[in-house]
Amino acid sequence: MAGLKVRKGDTVQVIAGKDRGTKGKVIAAFPREQKLLVEGVNRVRRHTKVTATTRGSKTGGIITKEAPIHVSNVMVVCPECEKPTRLGRRQDVVDASTGKTRPVRICKRCGKEI
């Protein structure tokens, strides 16, 4: 199974599901499950039991937090053209004398490095 093309810190737009059209920043990526945690997307309510903390305060109640969303339901938003795009890969030369290269992600729409 290949790794994810989307990384933590990328801005993505949801293309399918109840939050379709919403843009958000990737908080965490789970490559093994092919899922992402996106800020402000797929918010769910969790009922947590009231428990005492070490300082004596009590925590619990209804908490709203983000749930993971499948990577196929999002597209990366290019920072240059501000539109959802597919990603490509290109080898950029780091050192011409030694021929060292590094892979970079590029926007298929405008061709700029992401």
Curated annotation (Swiss-Prot):
Q: Which GO terms describe its biological process?
A: translation
Keywords, comma-separated and alphabetical: Ribonucleoprotein, Ribosomal protein, RNA-binding, rRNA-binding
Q: Which InterPro entries match?
A: KOW, Rib_uL2_dom2, Ribosomal_uL24, Ribosomal_uL24_CS, Ribosomal_uL24_KOW, Translation_prot_SH3-like_sf
Q: Which domain of life is it from?
A: Bacteria
Gene3D superfamilies named among the record's database cross-references: 2.30.30.30
Record flagged with keyword rRNA-binding: yes
- A Gene Ontology molecular function term of the record: structural constituent of ribosome
What residue ranges carry the coiled-coil annotation? none
Q: Which CDD domains does the entry link to?
A: KOW_RPL26
A GO cellular component annotation here is: ribosome
**What does this chain do?**
One of two assembly initiator proteins, it binds directly to the 5'-end of the 23S rRNA, where it nucleates assembly of the 50S subunit.
Similarity comment: family membership: Belongs to the universal ribosomal protein uL24 family.
According to the record's subunit comment, the protein's assembly and interactions are:
Part of the 50S ribosomal subunit.
Supply the name of the protein: Large ribosomal subunit protein uL24
Taxonomic path: Bacteria, Bacillati, Actinomycetota, Actinomycetes, Acidothermales
